[in-house]
């Protein structure tokens, strides 16, 4: 018996059996469909594989990035360092594209933008340095989020922020330090912006937590922060020259007197506020005359300090 089905094909109706008499699909059509399916599967697999390979390569690059930073910190040729750092920063940001939640990379980026802006941009182009500090801050705040400080830190009430900071442990110290450092410099370069000045208390709160958790982190950098903080303003505006001197002394003790930026900042901020020309001159002269590689692991910082000290000494008669 024959009958038409809904598709128009003729079928033979047989008890317990169904046999199609429609023309079979060409082998080429079947092959094309199979190839299409296989190609789709392969493309999906390749996409997933490319993603995982990219992340794997990024993770394997972390030790290389760290080694590169160590080598850069040992550099004493300022022109070479100035020309090389931007490429390193873009490399780090490229790795962040693959690993956006990697706190280590975010901290490296924040540190890099801070160092480049402070060492090579700020003295001649404050507006550009401000943008670089802001980029560093964004990376550091992302690292803080990964470390457990969620939410918009800039929008938090100060008391609420302090409560959240109290819950953080030593693992958050690097992110706290670089966030506070970049934030404070960004504020310093935008003093005419009331919104920026209003955030200073939050940057200070972040660095205060660093002091509480590990005051030796990054060569006692938190003490340098507060040495400048207390020394860069008159007492009527919250300055405290004794506290400032004590903070610089603590930073000097942590580094064995080999980190020249300690004397640089004490002369630049505290000695100028105290109108102490002799201290200003003597400290900066000592910075210039001390070999940059007295502290090999921080030779670049020392070379930058020497360069800045020479510029400050050139203005001594103008200020005193």
Question: What is each stretch, according to the model?
Answer:
Residues 1-34:
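N-terminal secretory signal peptides that target proteins for export/translocation
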Residues 35-41:
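Sec-dependent signal peptide recognition
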Residues 47-50:
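C-terminal motif of bacterial Sec signal peptides marking the signal peptidase cleavage site
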Residues 52-55:
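Bacterial signal peptide processing site
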Residues 63-94, 98-101, 112-212, 221-255, ...:
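Short coil/linker segments at helix-helix boundaries
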Residues 217-218:
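Charged, well-structured binding/catalytic surfaces in domain cores that contact anionic ligands
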Residues 311-320:
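Extracytoplasmic and endomembrane cell-envelope/extracellular-matrix remodeling and assembly machinery
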């Amino acid at each position: 018996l024959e009958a038409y089905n809904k598709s128009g094909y003729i079928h033979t109706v047989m008890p317990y059996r169904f046999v199609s008499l429609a023309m079979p699909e060409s082998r080429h059509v079947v092959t094309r469909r199979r190839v299409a399916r296989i190609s789709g599967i392969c493309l999906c697999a390749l996409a997933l594989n490319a993603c995982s390979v990219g992340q794997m390569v990024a993770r394997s690059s972390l030790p290389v990035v760290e080694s590169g930073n160590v080598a850069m910190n040992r550099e004493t040729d300022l022109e070479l360092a100035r020309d090389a750092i931007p490429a390193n920063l873009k490399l780090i940001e490229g790795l962040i594209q693959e690993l956006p939640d990697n706190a280590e990379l975010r901290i490296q980026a924040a540190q890099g933008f801070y160092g480049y802006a402070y060492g090579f941009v700020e003295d001649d182009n404050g507006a550009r340095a401000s943008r670089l500090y802001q980029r560093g801050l964004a990376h550091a705040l992302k690292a803080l989020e990964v470390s457990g400080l969620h939410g918009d830190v800039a929008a938090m009430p100060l008391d609420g922020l302090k409560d959240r900071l109290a819950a953080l442990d030593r693992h958050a110290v690097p992110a706290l330090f670089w966030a506070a450092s970049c934030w404070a410099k960004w504020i310093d370069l935008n003093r005419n912006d009331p919104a920026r000045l209003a955030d200073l208390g939050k940057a200070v709160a972040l660095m205060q937590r660093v002091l509480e958790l590990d005051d030796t982190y990054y060569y006692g950098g938190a003490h340098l922060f507060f040495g400048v903080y207390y020394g860069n303003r008159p007492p009527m505006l919250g300055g405290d020259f004794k506290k400032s001197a004590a903070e610089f002394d603590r930073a000097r003790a942590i580094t064995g007197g080999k980190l020249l930026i300690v004397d640089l900042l004490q002369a630049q901020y505290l000695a100028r506020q105290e109108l102490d020309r002799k201290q200003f001159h003597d400290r900066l002269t000592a910075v210039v005359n001390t070999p940059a590689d007295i502290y090999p692991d921080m030779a670049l910082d020392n070379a930058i300090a020497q360069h800045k000290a020479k510029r400050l000494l050139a203005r001594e008669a103008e200020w005193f």
